[in-house]
């Protein structure tokens, strides 16, 4: 077996125990408290969210600057990105969308009735809205970048160097991905900030952090190729910006929970989780699965069958985790 595959599965062995701790460790506490509002505002829950804020920042920042000091396996990044995409997709559909739909049904069901009225799929509609809003943000960023490139050409940019033009295109894609992921990360962080229980917060933490670790490593490698003059300064700057985006979202989510009560908190939770579902689906499908990580040299695992197995493994992991969530 290639070294990249060994490294990849070793990483998974280290991550899965963290998943078990996050999902099962606080389950008894969740069942002991039947009053959602008190758990939502409890000091222990807020402490967990603050811990998540710090953890996601530190791990993302370290991952972002790591390519400057370490030489990551190309195969590991190819499979890791696909695995993260499977985790993101399964989390959005099996966890976020399910919880949002259940909350909407509870809010819209009158006392003494068994079915909501009206029986409109609000969670699914808002998930579509989150997907489209994220796509719109990507389109705006792409338009701004393409306009900048056209302006440079009109100012007399040398068109004879085709290799340089190809390089600039790949650089533009990398910058677009970085900016878009920073935008997405704010909303991903909100998913942690508005978590109803400590186990939900830990679960959202490991899911988002797993994705951000691979994204940060890939971002760091792209920056080393793009800006060779000051690679360390660039890595630190961009890694800090990317790492701080999710904690900002966590802080926003904590403020939302701390300033709302009763059904208002439930409405905000349902709305935010529905929109976050759309964001997660877009990021997983468009950025992680469709584009993925493009190695600068041929690697053995950069083939459809290996990518499919990595995505399948990510989905299966979430499917197993959801056994303890139901």
From Swiss-Prot:
GO biological process terms held by the UniProt record: zinc ion transport
Chief location category: membrane
Any Pfam family the entry gives: Zip
Keyword entries, A-Z: Cell membrane, Ion transport, Membrane, Signal, Transmembrane, Transmembrane helix, Transport, Zinc, Zinc transport
Protein name: Zinc transporter 11
All ranges on the Cytoplasmic side of the membrane: 71-75, 143-174, 225-235, 284-305
Protein family according to the UniProt entry: Belongs to the ZIP transporter (TC 2.A.5) family.
Entry's Gene Ontology molecular function annotations: metal ion transmembrane transporter activity
Membrane topology: Multi-pass membrane protein
Function statement: Probably mediates zinc uptake from the rhizosphere.
GO CC aspect terms: nucleus; plasma membrane
Annotated localization: Cell membrane
Membrane-spanning intervals of the chain: 50-70, 76-96, 122-142, 175-195, 204-224, 236-256, 263-283, 306-326
